[in-house]
């Protein structure tokens, strides 16, 4: 199928940089998605410029992240110490920076806008109308969905966010959902037109995340080759639920005191509630499993691949996940996954074939599922053998192809006047021409 390609796409990622280390602050799967999809789009002949908010005075205004991929760090508000909840106060400054950059070029410099997360969608909505180009939006997470499955001690998403999401959903020319479940939520909870939603699964870098030697991976991490290693990778926050894994592990250890179980927690602080590693350290102490739990800071991708290879099992106990890149990366390395049956994890993990899906977050349920795997090496080996084959279905190449098709549909809708807005592209270009010529029509 022929897919027409935009010449240059403006990608908006306001609250987190694609260059940030995943697992720290607000950096996670979305950062990986934005950067890796951009790299693959560039390989297909599409120039990508990613606009993100600068968070350090040391951030260069422009960074060439890869051939054809440029990251623009926009100064908007204080560089450090600005809470994510306060970012809406800096959207005007961010918009000004984005529009100022576009104004340096002739109209039509950007063929299309792709916004990620609702804050970026607000910026994209305005830029779309000013530039006269289509807007494609990926939510990544939705307030209404998160609030339906809050972890204990977590803070509900504010009504202002849901209102903002509703506006972006209504104004976008196309919406990209990670899974059919997310597409259903966009329709049922936000009233999105199903015909404007494209389901495009995220992927993994299958050249980096692939099976390897477990013993050498463990040696590089200082892990005992004789232990059964169960690993959590992600931001330490209530939503990701690392405490669920620790409580389940404590129960398993109490049932089988001689079991050589090692829990490896890889990640940094983020969010509210269980936001600091020392809180998890204290939880491990109170559960009596301090000696069986190891904490590591967030790891670079090359090192993270060894973390997956060193593990017998990777746990993803999240309360909400639009997809779950960790699950795909782990399986690509030949490691099965035990995950909560929420959101996109039902797609990322093939239940009973490449891992197990657990209903709910009760300690007894998780302990039972965990015990059924860590005490059955033959079953673990069978799941591990199937895992890479399943992961092969998810690559950033496939993601980029899906995005290009969504971009094509967005352009068709926009140019035919069948998008969500009746704002004419011709009128938009005319307004900019007036602005650029000081109000004199040309």
From Swiss-Prot:
Gene label: mshA
What InterPro entries does the entry give?
A: Glyco_trans_1, Glyco_trans_4-like_N, Mycothiol_biosynthesis_MshA
The scientific name of the source species is Rhodococcus erythropolis (strain PR4 / NBRC 100887)
Presence of keyword Glycosyltransferase = yes
The UniProt family comment states: Belongs to the glycosyltransferase group 1 family. MshA subfamily.
One GO process term, biological-process aspect: mycothiol biosynthetic process
Looking up HAMAP family in the UniProt record yields:
MshA
Identify the EC number(s). 2.4.1.250
What's an example of a GO molecular-function annotation for this chain? D-inositol-3-phosphate glycosyltransferase activity
Binding-site residues for Mg(2+), renumbered to this chain:
308-309, 311, 335
- How does this chain assemble? Homodimer.
**Residue sites binding UDP-N-acetyl-alpha-D-glucosamine per the record:** 21-22, 29, 235, 240, 299, 321, 329
Q: Which UniProt keywords apply?
A: Glycosyltransferase, Magnesium, Metal-binding, Transferase
The record lists 1D-myo-inositol 3-phosphate as bound by 15, 26-31, 84, 117, 141, 161
Q: What class of enzyme is it?
A: transferase
- Protein name (database record): D-inositol 3-phosphate glycosyltransferase
Q: Which domain of life is it from?
A: Bacteria
The free-text function statement in the UniProt record for this protein reads: Catalyzes the transfer of a N-acetyl-glucosamine moiety to 1D-myo-inositol 3-phosphate to produce 1D-myo-inositol 2-acetamido-2-deoxy-glucopyranoside 3-phosphate in the mycothiol biosynthesis pathway.
Write down a Pfam family by its short name.
Glyco_trans_4_4
Q: Catalyses which reaction?
A: 1D-myo-inositol 3-phosphate + UDP-N-acetyl-alpha-D-glucosamine = 1D-myo-inositol 2-acetamido-2-deoxy-alpha-D-glucopyranoside 3-phosphate + UDP + H(+)
């Amino acid at each position: 199928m022929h897919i027409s390609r935009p010449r240059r796409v403006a990608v908006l990622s306001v609250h987190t940089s694609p260059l940030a280390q995943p697992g720290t602050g607000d950096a996670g799967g979305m950062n990986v998605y934005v950067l890796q999809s951009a790299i693959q789009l560039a390989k297909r002949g599409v120039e990508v410029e990613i606009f993100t908010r600068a968070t350090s005075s040391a951030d260069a205004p422009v960074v060439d992240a890869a051939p054809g991929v440029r990251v623009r760090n926009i100064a908007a508000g204080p560089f450090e110490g600005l809470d994510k909840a306060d970012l809406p106060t800096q959207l005007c400054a961010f918009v000004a920076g984005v529009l100022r950059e576009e104004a340096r070029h002739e109209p039509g410099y950007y063929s299309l806008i792709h916004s990620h997360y609702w804050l970026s969608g607000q910026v994209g909505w305005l830029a779309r109308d000013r530039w006269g180009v289509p807007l494609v939006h990926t939510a990544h997470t939705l307030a209404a969905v998160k609030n339906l499955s809050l972890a204990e001690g977590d803070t509900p998403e504010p009504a202002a966010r849901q209102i903002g999401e509703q506006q972006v959903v209504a104004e976008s020319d196309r919406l990209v959902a990670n899974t059919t479940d997310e597409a259903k939520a966009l329709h049922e909870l936000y009233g999105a037109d199903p015909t404007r939603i494209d389901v495009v699964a995220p992927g993994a870098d299958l050249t980096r995340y692939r099976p390897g030697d477990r013993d050498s991976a463990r040696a590089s991490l200082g892990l005992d080759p004789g232990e059964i290693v169960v690993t959590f990778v992600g931001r330490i926050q209530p939503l990701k639920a690392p405490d669920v894994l620790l409580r389940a592990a404590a129960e398993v250890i109490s049932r089988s005191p001689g079991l050589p179980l090692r829990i490896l927690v890889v990640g940094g602080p983020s969010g509210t509630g269980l936001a600091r590693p020392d809180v998890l350290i204290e939880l491990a102490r109170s559960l009596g499993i301090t000696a069986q739990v190891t904490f590591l800071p967030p790891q670079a991708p090359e090192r993270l691949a060894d973390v997956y290879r060193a593990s017998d099992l990777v746990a993803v106990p999240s309360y909400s996940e639009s997809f779950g890149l960790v699950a795909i990366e782990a399986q690509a390395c030949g490691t099965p996954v035990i995950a909560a049956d929420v959101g996109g994890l039902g797609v990322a993990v093939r239940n009973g074939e490449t891992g197990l899906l657990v209903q709910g977050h009760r300690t007894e349920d998780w302990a039972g599922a965990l015990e059924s795997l860590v005490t059955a090496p033959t079953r673990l080996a069978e799941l591990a053998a199937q895992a890479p084959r399943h992961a092969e279905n998810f690559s950033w190449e496939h993601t980029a192809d899906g995005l290009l098709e969504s971009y094509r549909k967005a352009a068709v809708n926009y140019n035919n006047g069948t998008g969500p807005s009746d704002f004419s592209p011709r009128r938009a270009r005319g307004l900019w021409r007036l602005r650029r010529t000081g109000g004199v029509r040309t």
